[in-house]
Regions:
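Conserved Class I S-adenosyl-L-methionine
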Residues: 166, 196, 204-234
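Catalytic cores of RNA-modifying enzymes
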Residues: 1-190, 226-232
Length: 234
């Protein structure tokens, strides 16, 4: 079994919080739900009772095998092992207690995927990054808020996990606004490596010209995305 600490993963052990996550996901019998991180499967019975189909993926093959044994009664459940970000499944709703080490990757992946909405649980510090303003923003903040509507649902205390993490978590509801392609996401990350420079000097790095003296921190999220689009057009 993959050591969970290597993945930064802590398993939810609270049924009431599991119910809150599933209720906030607003699942109908027409929905296909994609769960990243099967774990012990605390969400699976709740998801399967509401959805048309549930696809649950875990990086740990042993956990997937255990889930197949424990949840064989659900005909609408598909269990897979491997890297969930490489799966080609289509879905309408995304649900995940995101491993801390994979949270940024998950947001960038979701920004590229077409889906309706979802509920994710992330480390409190990471949640604050996603909704940060101005100088506290990171590239992932821009990517997240441009591609997604994000609403904070609840703080989840660390004693609701096994093993307990060092910090609390936050449940977020996300709704898809628009897709961002992989090249654009990569370029937004590159732009933030020059965040202390002016737009004029950033564009010089890409052999382009500008007279704009503003720094990245002075631009809106939309302006940063448009800057990346401008660079890609050349």
């Amino acid at each position: 079994m993959i050591k969970r600490k290597l993945l930064g993963q802590h398993f939810l052990n609270s049924k009431s919080i599991a119910e809150l996550i599933v209720n906030e996901a607003e699942i109908s019998k027409d929905d296909v739900v994609f769960e990243l991180g099967t774990g012990p499967g605390i969400l699976i019975p709740l998801l399967c009772k509401k959805a048309k189909k549930v696809i649950s993926v875990d990086a740990d093959e042993q956990l997937t095998k255990k889930a197949r044994s424990n949840f064989s009664q659900f005909d609408n459940l598909t269990l897979k092992s491997g890297d969930g970000f490489k799966k080609k499944d289509t879905f309408s709703i995304f649900v995940s207690n995101l491993p801390y080490s994979k949270s940024k990757d998950a947001i960038e992946w979701l920004a590229q995927k077409s889906f309706s909405h979802g509920v994710i649980m992330v480390q409190k510090e990471f949640a604050e990054k996603l909704i940060a303003k101005s100088k506290d923003r990171r590239a992932v903040s821009i990517i997240a808020t441009y591609a997604l509507d994000i609403k904070k649902i609840s703080i989840v205390r660390k004693n609701n996990f096994s093993p307990p993490p060092k910090v609390d978590s936050v449940i977020l509801k996300i709704s898809k606004k628009t897709d961002l392609d992989k090249k654009l996401i990569s370029l937004i990350n590159d732009i933030f490596s020059y965040r202390r420079k002016t737009v004029k000097n950033i564009l010089k790095q890409f052999n382009q010209q500008s007279t704009i003296e503003k720094r990245i921190d002075d631009l809106t999220g939309e302006e940063i995305v448009n800057l990346a689009k401008q660079i890609l057009k050349k």
